Regions:
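Short, helix-capping/interhelical loops that line the mouth of catalytic, cofactor-
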Residues: 1-12, 61-111, 160-169, 285-286
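Short, contiguous alpha-helical
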Residues: 14, 34-85, 118, 125, ...
């Protein structure tokens, strides 16, 4: 994986664009035209639409918005503009075939590389104040997000796992937990316990000197955080299973009012991809295969309501996003009674993610044990705060003080108020996208994404 370049290098950006597109194409290479339409579901897109939308977005922002070129496809906006096309109508569109979609995808990338490749980036800025590199990065990161969406769509639709070239070398310090290699004891290994965070005044958000930030991260602002204790690891399957076995899904006293309404409507009695086997053993569906539940893997595909209900049962709580970012980014003073002014870009420091620090980029083709990868610990000893599994926080997704939408106005503002913030990335997240201050957000009922959580003491 090519990290997001630190400088506005045409060659580096061109290489990142090509690598990102190659990954997108790998994710759908084995799928038929019919599989790339799939059933009409509220939580996924037809993949022929999704892949075409990725190319349309790149064309719109780089070629049309910045360069003021004419559309390649006259009907492109009516097919692929997510702001104009209601989600449930995307299956009814006259979508091109897979082959035609791939030809469009390649044509747009070729045009971008031809115009913005080795001969240099356009240094001038448009009326909105953003230069060409900004829009190339925007399109690239957008493609990274959709590559993750394509992967969880394959999980949702019971497709086989994608065949990813980078996954062929599975060393690099990672020790993947093979699907189905369960914790034979049936008991959790000793927990790493809680990290003590002294609290204090902390800068939440991103600073203007970063190469690229999304509008919802702007800008870093001082927040006061009280001392707290946070789990050093994400919650494991072994820790979540007793909540299920104790009837946690059948006790309305453990659920927020809207959470209980969701549980009754969904008929949820356990995580969405769990299934009870004869003899009381749990199985988990990993893409198209049912495997014995792996005790030390993080609990996956649980929504915010499920995480909140577990916390009530366990006498714990979810961290706020400020607490989460402090635990990931801050450094303790020598006496551990306060934090220093330093703020890390990643839990381990400012160096780009490596395979011995974070499970990202499909490298393990799944999650690893929650106590793996100690080289990626934060200054407070919190593990895997980047990669492996997205982590729900207690915080509603909303603007930071002084928020101003970026050119892509539909990215953040329409979702303020009814989504929850997740942090940290998961095993399919690209290394060029994720860092401590990146904010993801989903509606609290979403169980299809690779979402889990860690807890805080009350």
């Amino acid at each position: 994986m090519i990290p997001m370049p630190a400088q506005d290098s045409s060659l580096e950006l061109a290489s990142a664009l090509q690598e990102g597109r190659a990954r997108t194409l790998e994710l759908i290479a084995d799928l038929t035209d019919e599989q790339m339409i799939g059933p009409r579901l509220a939580i996924v897109n037809p993949l022929r639409w999704e892949v075409g939308h990725v190319a349309w977005f790149q064309e719109y922002w780089v070629l049309r918005h910045f360069r003021r070129e004419s559309p390649t496809r006259p009907e492109g906006d009516s097919l692929y503009d997510s702001a104009r096309i209601a989600h449930d109508t995307r299956w009814d569109l006259p979508l091109p075939s897979k082959a035609e979609t791939l030809a469009y995808v390649q044509r747009i990338l070729d045009r971008v590389l031809e115009t913005h490749g080795p001969k240099g980036l356009e240094a001038s800025r448009r009326d909105d104040g953003y230069d060409e590199a900004y829009f190339i990065r925007l399109a690239l990161l957008h493609e990274y997000m959709h590559a993750e969406a394509i992967t969880y769509t394959r999980q949702t639709l019971n497709y086989t796992p994608p065949k990813i070239s980078i996954a062929q070398g599975r060393s690099d310090g990672l020790q993947p937990h093979p699907p189905g290699s369960e914790d034979r004891s049936g008991h959790s290994q000793p927990s790493l316990g809680d990290a003590e965070i002294p609290g204090g005044t902390f800068l939440l958000g991103s600073s203007p000197d970063m190469t690229f930030v999304f509008d919802n991260e702007q800008w870093a602002h001082a927040v006061t955080v009280r001392p707290f204790r946070i789990a050093r690891t994400a919650l494991s399957n072994t820790e979540f299973a007793p909540f299920v076995d104790d009837g946690g899904y059948k006790r309305p006293d453990l659920w927020a009012e809207d959470g209980w309404r969701w549980r009754e409507s969904a008929g949820a009695e356990h995580p969405v991809y769990w299934q009870r086997q004869a003899g009381s053993r749990w199985l988990r569906r990993n893409f198209d295969e049912w495997v014995p539940l792996e005790g030390r893997l993080p609990v996956l595909h649980v929504n915010w309501y499920e995480a909140d209900a577990y916390c009530r049962w366990a006498g714990r709580r979810l961290p706020t996003e400020a607490e989460w970012e402090m635990a990931a980014s801050a450094e303790p003073s020598p006496d551990a009674q306060s934090i220093t002014p330093n703020k890390r870009l990643f839990p381990w420091g400012d160096e780009a993610p490596t395979a011995d620090r974070a499970n990202l980029n499909w490298r393990a083709m799944g999650c690893v044990d929650v106590d793996a990868l100690p080289a990626g610990d934060s200054a407070f000893g919190c593990r895997q705060m980047i990669g492996n599994v997205w982590e729900w926080t207690a915080t509603d997704f909303g603007p930071y003080p002084g928020f101003s939408p970026g050119p892509y106005k539909e990215y953040s503002a329409p979702w303020f108020g009814d989504h929850k913030v997740l942090r940290g990335g998961c095993w399919v997240t690209r290394t060029g996208l994720i860092r401590n201050n990146y904010r993801n957000f989903y509606q609290p009922h979403r169980r299809d994404v690779w979402g889990g959580f860690r807890t805080c003491a009350l």
